[in-house]
Regions:
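Membrane-anchoring hydrophobic helices of lipid-metabolizing enzymes
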Residues: 1-105, 110, 122, 139-144, ...
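Short, composition-biased local secondary-structure segments
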Residues: 5-10, 110-116, 165-178
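Active-site catalytic microenvironments for nucleophilic, acid-base chemistry
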Residues: 9, 117-121, 208
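Short amphipathic alpha-helical segments and helix-helix/interface helices
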Residues: 91-92, 115-119, 142-143, 163-164, ...
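Anion (oxyanion) recognition and catalysis
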Residues: 95, 119, 147, 167, ...
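Catalytic core of membrane glycerolipid acyltransferases/transacylases, capturing the structured
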Residues: 98-157, 180-192, 196, 220
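Membrane-associated lipid acylation/remodeling enzymes share a hydrophobic transmembrane-juxtamembrane segment
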Residues: 158-221
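Short, electropositive alpha-helical surface patch
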Residues: 226-231
Length: 231
């Protein structure tokens, strides 16, 4: 954990550079993943091989950057100078906590950094629901980083009762809704010509707690970050 904190002190610009290097390394060292990504993009988006390969390579850099941005969670937050808020009025409503709030996002943009924003939203109970890592050290480090702004991190298998308790205190619960999941836990919706599983857990808990649902994404905008909030 201490090494992760030191790595975060490198700052946003150096982490971007590291991500480019790591993405290139992964692209070179993982030929099966490289082919799978390129073929999937070409098939689902109906693109040429060259365009699909370019997008696939960019996705490797994106994933590397998302992974490394986890060490920046302690450095980020709602008052960070690199953050732009698209709808300040909705952010203020969210912060007031007049109703329990279920926040949904996806593996889109700088999703790891959203943990810092949730921690800064309010003093009400705040939970981030995640899938735990099988590697205990990795799980420990990422949990410490994600909770560094005060939000509690909880595994999705044990989440239902803690989430309901938090929501009944006008708290906040954040979910990544695009994880693949079992048929009993999912809605299936059309996506790029196939059926994709969407976890129905956040919707069920929101209904039970009479909570507002807030779709939120943190998008990279050049060297800056832009938070998009819907209600």
């Amino acid at each position: 954990y201490g090494f992760a904190l030191l790595l975060g002190k490198l700052g946003f610009s150096r982490i971007r550079s590291l991500a480019r290097g790591l993405g290139s390394l992964l692209w070179t060292c993982l030929p099966k993943r490289r082919r799978l990504a390129t073929e999937s993009i070409a098939r689902h988006l109906e693109l040429s091989q060259a365009t699909a390969e370019s997008l696939a390579r960019a996705s490797f850099t994106h994933n590397a950057r998302s992974f490394l941005e986890s060490v920046l969670v302690p450095e980020f937050g709602l008052s960070h100078p690199l953050l732009d808020v698209e709808r300040p009025d909705l952010l203020e409503r969210l912060k007031r906590g007049e109703r329990p709030s279920v926040i949904t996002t996806a593996h889109l943009g700088a999703w790891e950094l959203l943990a810092s924003l949730l921690g800064d939203v309010s003093d009400h109970p705040r939970l981030t629901v995640v899938r735990t890592y099988k590697n205990k050290l990795m799980d420990y480090v990422t949990t410490r980083l994600r909770s560094s702004h005060g939000a509690d991190v909880i595994g999705h298998r044990e989440a239902a009762f803690p989430v309901l308790r938090a929501l009944r205190k006008n708290g906040y619960a954040a979910f990544l809704a695009d994880h693949n999941t079992s048929r009993s836990e999912a809605f299936f919706l059309p996506f790029l010509g196939e059926e994709a599983a969407v976890n129905k857990g956040p919707a069920v808990l929101a209904v039970r707690a009479k909570a507002l649902v807030w779709p939120i994404a943190l998008i990279r905008d050049g060297d800056r970050y832009r938070i998009i909030i819907e209600e």
